[in-house]
């Protein structure tokens, strides 16, 4: 079981997509959790489907130029049910061949108190 979580700071550029494709190929994750996609839902899903054809995924749009969340999983290795929540995307997961279930929350919050530091 491999779960990869990344703050990608945008999915729009071709160079970023190719870089992510290399990372995903080298690590072979079963579940990918991306934060700060900085995209509305459709472009994020389109970019991810190019990187990982055949995967299933769920996305939440960004709020302007910040935020955006995408969760993806390989249906050959894991069965997931995705729920959009106020806090992010909740995945109820079970890896194939296992009876153990796993709940994963993919969330991203803005840094609200940066002036304090």
For each feature predicted by the language model, list its residue ranges:
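A shared catalytic/ligand-binding motif for oxyanion handling
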Residues: 1-117
């Amino acid at each position: 079981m491999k779960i990869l979580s990344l703050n990608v700071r945008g999915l729009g550029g071709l160079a970023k997509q190719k870089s992510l494709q290399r990372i995903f190929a080298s690590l072979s994750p079963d579940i990918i959790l991306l934060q700060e996609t900085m995209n509305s839902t459709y472009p994020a899903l389109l970019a991810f489907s190019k990187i990982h054809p055949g995967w299933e995924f769920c996305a939440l749009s960004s709020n302007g130029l910040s935020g955006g969340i995408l969760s993806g999983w390989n249906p050959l290795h894991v069965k997931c049910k995705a729920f959009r929540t106020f806090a992010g995307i909740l995945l109820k997961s079970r890896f194939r061949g296992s009876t153990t279930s796993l709940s994963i929350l993919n969330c991203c919050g803005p840094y609200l108190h940066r002036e304090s530091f």
